[in-house]
C-alpha cells in the first residue's frame, strides 16, 4: 500500500536521528523498520494507550512529508490500532495511519531501549 505519510517536525527529527544511529539512508526504511519493531513488542497498550498519545493541541499540525510503500498487512494493522484506541477523528485513512506511526516515534523517543530497528 502506497500512501503519503504526515509527520510533525519533531517526528522528522526522530527519523533523522534514527537514520544516523543505525546508518540507514532512507526515511522509508526507518519508518518500516520502526513499525515492524513496534509490532514485535506485541504490546500495543505500551505504545498507544498512554496519556501522552492523546492530543492536547496541534493534533492536526502534521504535514504530508513523503510517500511510503508499506505491505498491506502492516498497513491494515496500523488501521486497526487506530480504531482500537481513542484517537481524535481524522479526515482520511492516510492521516489515521500516520497518527499511529507518529505514536510509534513518540514511544521510540521516550523509550529508546524498548525498540530495536
Task: Label the model's feature ranges.
Residues 8-29, 33, 71-95:
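Surface-exposed, Lys/Arg-rich phosphate-binding patches that contact polyanionic backbones
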Residues 25-50, 89-117:
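Short, basic amphipathic alpha-helical segments that act as recognition/interaction helices
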Residues 40-83, 110-117:
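Short, positively charged interaction helices/loops
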Amino acid at each position: 500500500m502506497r500512501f503519503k505519510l504526515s509527520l510533525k517536525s519533531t517526528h522528522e527529527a526522530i527519523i533523522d536521528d534514527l537514520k544516523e544511529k543505525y546508518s540507514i539512508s532512507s526515511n522509508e526504511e526507518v519508518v518500516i523498520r520502526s513499525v515492524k519493531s513496534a509490532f514485535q513488542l506485541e504490546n500495543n497498550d505500551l505504545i498507544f494507550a498512554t496519556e501522552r498519545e492523546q492530543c492536547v493541541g496541534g493534533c492536526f499540525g502534521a504535514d504530508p512529508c513523503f510517500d511510503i510503500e508499506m505491505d498491506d498487512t502492516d498497513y491494515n494493522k496500523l488501521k486497526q490500532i487506530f480504531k482500537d484506541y481513542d484517537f481524535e477523528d481524522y479526515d482520511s485513512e492516510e492521516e489515521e495511519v500516520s497518527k499511529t506511526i507518529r505514536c510509534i516515534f513518540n514511544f521510540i523517543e521516550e523509550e529508546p531501549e524498548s525498540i530495536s530497528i
